[in-house]
UniProtKB/Swiss-Prot annotation:
This is Probable inactive serine/threonine-protein kinase slob1. Residues 426-585 are annotated as: Disordered. Belongs to the protein kinase superfamily. Ser/Thr protein kinase family. Zn(2+) 2 binds at C43, C46, C74, C77. Residues 513-532 have a biased composition (Pro residues). It comes from Dictyostelium discoideum (Social amoeba). A zinc finger (FYVE-type) spans 21-82. One of its GO terms (molecular function) is actin binding.
């Protein structure tokens, strides 16, 4: 299978390299060995080998991956892909509603994950059009700062306004100031709108990639084809590896250093410096820094794990911008990321003159400062900075204090717990815990003393066992009976009486395990039987005669004689009212 394909836009995208079947004898997920029945299957995203049950997930990958239709994915790739997909969809909806509220910008389309994977699920991008700027295209960064990472509260309206004004006030010729900043408090998202440069970033220029392609597919180092001759000079190899002209590298480096000095003068140590955060402005042939807001939102830098690693000198942590600048310089010349700083010794033949000595100076134990690095003769390139732009970049005192309080507050367990476990809170907790421990110790000592005084010499074993049980009971009841002075006095009672009175076990057992309900009493009357003749009302002569007439047809005459007896009972009827009314008249 060919490792590279071309999408509809004409950009070459490298697929994930499939591992050979012989390289894995068991599934990478369930660790079960492969057999004739349990066959090998490759994940289309990562290229690893799994069994059928561990890779039975199908999803449609973006066209940049070079596949069409649903493709087989492993469990981890499917979860991350679906999670990012849902996250991007929600961010796109938030951006649509937020941009619709402003009459200046119009939502165009969502973008793939063009940012670095270090941001995880906290950053996505979309395209918009500036209606007031002649319909120019803009890139909208949708940031979701987590509560543990953001040093200021998103629910504070004053902090929101201060963040917007501070970010818009940072103006410099080599810093791309946002056009607008929108804070969506309902969704805890921040929208930073910038001008879109078709040339992309410096990393796009190094890797010759499209700016809007996914991050994990466009930055793939491709080693140039070696010549037929086995021997090659160092000059020819340096020319093949130097992807950018040396003069352009010198000019860009000088501009980057000047922008870093401006940010340092405002109190921002821009540790988020890498080639993806340096855009190329072709109109005036300059480079401009972006994503300055990352320093004010507590997001981790790209080189955070490397700089704060074990065994690195303290000068690396004190000069974060210089270390990041050294990584950028190495990648602009060689064309691949540096990784560990000791790797520069492996590329000595590829460096131009004085560059290797400069990198050695940057990654030494005594790292130079920005002011010392700018004075290096290798950066002596004429650059003009307008004085008006520097005047526009001045900040107010309130904005400088906001930067001082919130800049470079990286997300870490210590930083996230600083609000709840401050020094004052720790002192309060320690004092309260010491008081509780002292009270408990005093109670235990009092209990043991009383029992030791009461117990006799012959009954030492019993007296040694009693304090442990009663002290536990007293400690448990002291929490609920702090205001009752009689509760601790139970320890002065004799051991036999304390054992009976102190543990209230019988009511607890009665409440939780009640006796079974008593059986129904025997004297209770049984359910009523069907009505019998004994309980019927007394029979009347009319009824008896009626029954006899039913039985014997000869009793019809008797029924006629007994009918007058029933008339007084029916005197209440409506016919009896007529004669009474006539008498009154």
């Amino acid at each position: 299978m060919d490792s590279s394909t071309a999408n509809s836009s004409g950009t070459a995208i490298s697929k994930a390299e499939w591992k050979p079947d012989q390289s894995s004898l068991e599934c990478n997920d369930c660790q079960l060995p492969f057999t004739l029945i349990r066959r090998r299957h490759h994940c289309r995203k990562c290229g690893s080998i799994f069994c059928d049950s561990c890779s039975s997930f199908y999803s449609i990958l973006p066209i940049e991956y070079g596949y069409t239709g649903q493709q087989r994915l492993c469990r981890s790739c499917n979860n991350s892909f679906e999670q990012k997909k849902q996250y991007f969809e929600t961010d796109a909806l938030v951006a649509q509603f937020q941009l619709r509220s402003t009459a200046q910008f119009e939502y165009s389309k969502p973008l793939q994950d063009i940012g670095h994977t270090k941001h995880g699920l906290r950053k996505s991008y979309c395209m918009a059009k500036n209606s007031m700027g002649g319909g120019e295209e803009c890139v909208v960064s949708i940031i979701t700062p987590t509560p543990s990472s953001c040093p200021w509260s998103m629910s504070n309206e004053k902090k929101k306004r201060k963040f917007e004004k501070t970010l818009l006030s940072l103006k410099h010729p080599y810093i791309l100031t946002p056009i607008n900043v929108e804070v969506s408090g309902a969704n805890d998202k921040i929208l930073v709108i910038r001008t879109f440069f078709k040339q992309g970033s410096l990393r796009d220029q190094v890797y010759k990639s499209k700016p809007l392609s996914p991050y994990d597919t466009k930055y793939i180092y491709k080693q140039p084809k070696s010549s037929s001759s086995s021997s090659s000079s160092s000059s020819s190899s340096s020319q093949s590896q130097s992807v950018l002209p040396i003069k352009s590298i010198q000019k860009y480096c000088k501009q980057i250093l000047e922008s870093l000095l401006y940010l340092k003068s405002k109190g921002i140590q821009f540790s988020h410096l890498h080639l993806s955060n340096i855009l190329i402005n072709q109109s005036n042939d300059t480079c401009q820094l972006v994503d300055i807001e990352n320093c004010l939102l507590g997001m981790k830098p790209l080189f955070n794990d490397y700089i704060y690693g074990i065994g690195l000198p303290q000068s690396f942590k004190d000069n974060l911008e210089v270390i990041c600048f050294g990584h950028c310089l190495f990648e602009m010349i060689i064309g691949i990321p540096l990784g560990d700083h000791s790797n520069i010794n492996s590329f000595i033949p590829l460096f131009p003159d004085k560059v290797f000595l400069l990198l050695q100076q940057i990654f030494s134990e005594k790292t130079p400062t920005l002011e010392e690095l700018v004075k290096n003769p290798w950066f002596e390139v004429t650059t003009t900075i307008e004085q008006q732009s520097l005047q526009n970049g001045k900040l107010k005192k309130s904005q400088l204090t906001f930067i001082k309080d919130n800049s470079n507050k990286f997300e870490s367990p210590k930083v996230s717990l600083s609000g709840s476990f401050s020094s004052s809170n720790i002192s309060k907790l320690s004092s309260s815990s010491s008081n509780n421990n002292s009270n408990n110790n005093n109670n235990n000592n009092n209990n043991s003393n009383t029992f030791n005084n009461i117990s006799s010499n012959d009954d030492k074993r019993k007296s040694m066992k009693l304090p442990s049980s009663t002290s536990l009971l007293n400690n448990s009841f002291n929490l609920s009976n702090n205001n009752n002075p009689s509760s601790p006095s139970t320890s002065t009672i004799s051991p036999n009486s304390s054992l009976i009175s102190s543990p209230p076990k019988t009511p607890i057992l009665q409440t939780f395990t009640p006796p079974p309900p008593p059986p129904p009493p025997k004297s209770a009357p049984p359910p009523p039987p069907p009505p019998s003749s004994s309980k019927l009302p007394p029979s009347s002569s009319s009824r008896n005669s009626l029954l006899e007439s039913i039985r014997n047809a000869d009793n019809a005459k008797k029924l006629k004689k007994t009918t007058p007896n029933t008339k007084p009972k029916s005197s209440i009827g409506p016919h009896s009212l007529k004669p009474s009314s006539t008498k009154k008249k």
